[in-house]
Amino acid sequence: MSESNRKSYTDFNVELLEKEKQKKKLKKPDRYKVILINDDYTPQEFVVYVLAVVFRKSMDESRQIMWRAHTEGSAVCGVYSLDIARTKVAEVHKLADDAGHPLQCQLAKEEEE
């Protein structure tokens, strides 16, 4: 094989690799909001505690989220990948069940911009 043939073969491979890279642009993974649902039975102090423990919010942030849920019916606690969001929801439900409270939260897929 001559030198000119090798060069064109290499150039051809590089072109193919570049085209494949363009085709395989990865999309960002979906993100999910964890939404706290207000109820009339769970004490506000417990909700603040859960937000601080599960979502690692400051006491101030926890109170703000709790109050938003209380006044608006629901509030976003955070936005995460699906696995992490599911884990957060499970942790909230476990803490609430263990304490005998009906506190609920749910997932909602975040809208793409």
Swiss-Prot record:
Gene Ontology biological process: protein catabolic process; proteolysis
Family the UniProt entry places it in: Belongs to the ClpS family.
Xref: InterPro entries: ClpS, ClpS_core, Ribosomal_bL12_C/ClpS-like
NCBIfam families: PRK00033.1-5
SUPFAM superfamilies: ClpS-like
UniProt cross-references to PANTHER family, sorted A to Z: ATP-DEPENDENT CLP PROTEASE ADAPTER PROTEIN CLPS, ATP-DEPENDENT CLP PROTEASE ADAPTER PROTEIN CLPS1, CHLOROPLASTIC
Subunit structure: Binds to the N-terminal domain of the chaperone ClpA.
Name listed for the protein in its UniProt record: ATP-dependent Clp protease adapter protein ClpS
A Pfam family the protein falls into: ClpS
Function: Involved in the modulation of the specificity of the ClpAP-mediated ATP-dependent protein degradation.
Highest taxon, organism lineage: Bacteria
Disulfide pattern: none
